[in-house]
Amino acid sequence: REPNLTDRTVAALWAPTGGIVCPFNLAIAAGENAIMNGVEFQFETEASSIEKAKDGYIIHTNKGDMETKAIVNAAGLYADVFHNMVSENKIHITARKGEYLFFDKSVGTIFNTTVVPLPGKMGKGIAASYTINGNFFIGPTATDVEDKEGLNTTAEILDKLKEMAASDGYLTRFPLPLNKVITSFAGARAHEDHHEFIVQELEDAPNFFDAAGIESPGLTSSPAIGERLAKIISEKMHLEKKETFNPKRAGFVRFNEISDEEREKLIEENPLYGNVI
């Protein structure tokens, strides 16, 4: 199934139900679907502190105070900050930076599936996969950093990644073509000190619900985390199911994948489609 795997491979676990998704489009789609169903987003609003109140919480922000009966803490790298504002049972989250190398589409099909090595203490390891647009990539690395906003790539780490990619026998049985690398980027996942996904109501802070320490495989876990939290919250607060909930969100037009006739029709309906980006 994977003829290009390194000759050092002795065994593999195949997950035929696995797949890939664009994480950016998934987040946008979920947000748009939430708006369709009545959610209101408060953009550019920074929560500076949380105060326990008689019937819930008061959230102090740069745009005034907000009163709420419940809080879902899904603040990623900063989930520990908000958790620790209301709970005596403190947690600590470290930013674990991961860096990637992306290759041009001309590299072609190296693997037919996502290939992940044996995991280590820092995570699942440096994997090889594709974007939904067909770009091959390898990553992420794993480096704990102090700056939670530090999403810059580093020459030292990228050099190690390139050295690994150019060698025989890491994941592939031949060196990867480094002249086909078109970009690199970094991201940070929220590593909880005890390697735990914390998905629960806080014992000493009623109606404060954590989704904290969600690192890899957090994206894969997100539907199950959402269902679990929805169940916990609805049972605790005696919520009723919204019968008019619409779970569907229309996809967007992929302009480069449609026919010339379809493009002309879209431009007639909306001239902005005629702007080349």
Give the ranges of each region predicted by the language model.
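Flavin (FAD/FMN) cofactor-binding and adjacent substrate-gating region
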Residues: 1-43, 48-55, 60, 192
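Active-site catalytic microenvironments for nucleophilic, acid-base chemistry
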Residues: 33, 81, 85, 232, ...
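Hydrophobic (often cysteine-bearing) scaffold residues that line and stabilize catalytic clefts
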Residues: 23, 81, 222
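Flavin-dependent oxidoreductases
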Residues: 50-154, 255-268
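Short, well-ordered beta-strand elements within core beta-sheets of diverse protein domains
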Residues: 18-19, 275-277
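Hydrophobic/aromatic beta-strand patches that form the interior of the parallel beta-sheet core
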Residues: 42, 72, 209-211
